[in-house]
Amino acid sequence: MFFKQLAVLSFATSALAAHGVRNPGTNSLNFNRIDKRFTFPIPESQGSQTFEATYTISGNETFDGGMKTYGRGVDCSGQAEGGDSDAVFIVKDGGTLKNAIIGADQIEGVHCEGSCTIENVWWEAVCEDALSLKTGDGPFTVIGGGAQNADDKVIQHNGGGTVSISGFTAYNFGKLYRSCGNCDEMYERHVTLESVTAVSGSASLVGINSNYGDTATIKSDTCVTDVDTVCTEYEGTDNNDEEPQEISTGPSNACQYTDPLPSC
């Protein structure tokens, strides 16, 4: 009888593991973890174009990239800070970039100088940052698209105002969104995440500076798998020579979400 019960238990455990179900009392999946089989859903490229200089999208202009891959023909320089001249695109106040793939052959990705819309834009591989919201008080809108293989940040918010991120996919990243923690000029910033898919995040989905009044609102239709922390609060500083200090993690008045978020 004992051996029959043991055999049944062994079969049940194997069945759960085969379907990637968590073992009771553990925090890991048996055998088939989602991040091991996750496929980053980047669209098929419709061609490629290499810019010799940064391409500027003027205010109120919409640049439709036709799902081509755009780059600068250079090697990534890691986390060394680049400048506007290293970006693939600069989007001026009121401009829109849509339907584009940012190739791995670049340093700075996309810069927004003022309010911008980034729609269905994908990053093959993030270098320093994927998207830098450099100036202005927004609103900044990210619709769809995605980024993968970011050692640190995907979206860096240096200006003020509000960022809306919806339907975005982040895979193998450090932080999806970071409100600048030590810019020379600090602002109150707000971010909302809706229908975001985040898999394999080594640091935090969102990082904000609550001492400057920042807030993060993460809707319950956002899913996370193997993301170290959902929301981290920092004490930001306007001294660029200092690093911001972590205050807390988890839901709060500044980090607004229901814990736990669903798995992807």
Curated annotation (Swiss-Prot):
Keyword Glycoprotein: yes
Polar residues: bias regions: 246-256
Name of a matching Pfam family: Pectate_lyase
InterPro entries in the cross-refs: Pectate_lyase_PlyH/PlyE-like (IPR004898), Pectin_lyas_fold (IPR012334), Pectin_lyase_fold/virulence (IPR011050)
Region described as Disordered: spans on this chain: 234-264
GO molecular function terms attached to this record: pectate lyase activity
Gene Ontology CC annotation, any one: extracellular region
Example GO BP: pectin catabolic process
Subcellular location: Secreted
Predominant subcellular localization, coarse grouping: secreted
Cofactors, names only: Ca(2+)
Details of cofactor binding: Binds 1 Ca(2+) ion per subunit.
Enzyme class: lyase
Protein family: Belongs to the polysaccharide lyase 3 family.
Function: Pectinolytic enzyme consist of four classes of enzymes: pectin lyase, polygalacturonase, pectin methylesterase and rhamnogalacturonase. Among pectinolytic enzymes, pectin lyase is the most important in depolymerization of pectin, since it cleaves internal glycosidic bonds of highly methylated pectins. Favors pectate, the anion, over pectin, the methyl ester.
Protein name: Probable pectate lyase D
Organism, as annotated: Emericella nidulans (strain FGSC A4 / ATCC 38163 / CBS 112.46 / NRRL 194 / M139)
